[in-house]
Amino acid sequence: MSSGKSAGKKRLRRVHYYPGCSLMSSAKDFGTSLFQMFRLMGTWVEPLEDWNCCGASPAHSVNPDYATLLAGRNLLLAERQGIDDLYVVCPSCFVRLRTAEKTLSTDGSLNAKLAKACGREYEGGVQVKFTPEILSDAPIVFEKAVMNPLEGLRGVLYFGCLLTRPEWITGFDIRPYERKLKRLVNVLGVETPDWSFSKQCCGSHLAVTKSDMVDGMVDRIRDHARRAGANCIIAFCPLCQVNLELRGKEVEPLPVFYISELIGLAAKLPGHENWVKKHLVDPRPLLSFLELL
């Protein structure tokens, strides 16, 4: 029988997630801030074991079937590990895994190829979910944790284009989460001006092959953010974050934060001062001017 002391302990919610390549490399600080944020929420996060690259744009642009098999292997691993809900941080990874989930459920020949490569077919037992689905129901938790209200920050929420396109694949309606995430950011002390570019494309991987075109796309996003009265952008995608800070030529850049970084700043989570040092557009002058850092 459990003692009264152990029985009274609050059980941590366990969440399984797919890390993806960016979280382990170019967006490593995003990953660190996410883990600190989940700890604040009382959530224990575990990575999918033995995961591989989802294929992202390079693979599915060259060989769609091979890209589906890459993502499909991750779904098989999740099934083997008894994972019902697999949370994904990166929108690009989310779309690739959702695509594999849909394709393997309807294309028997491709599922047979997966079985030949990996030893079994995918049975369709995994739900692929996007990480903000967890965050959207936790504003009260974060409000109680605020030690450093982020007053003076005015950030527009930027989701990018991948989450909702193509709709028949993602089946993801961002609108209810957009309202909830706006409220979450507001409890941190951040104003969230309305704007119409929250789902516009940043150029994605075209930044490598058609950088001039992407510069124009990013300039339009920055221009509309500034016209809305924003002094920063809040992004949910590692690639969008890089493009919005690195690309663009005509419009003065804005700092681009991840929502987990803002939570870390407001709650003074361990390491929060180091995360902002890694940005391509240094947010420290803005944060220092507002006496937030």
Question: Residue spans of the language-model regions?
Answer:
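Iron-sulfur cluster-binding electron-transfer modules in prokaryotic oxidoreductases
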Residues: 2-293
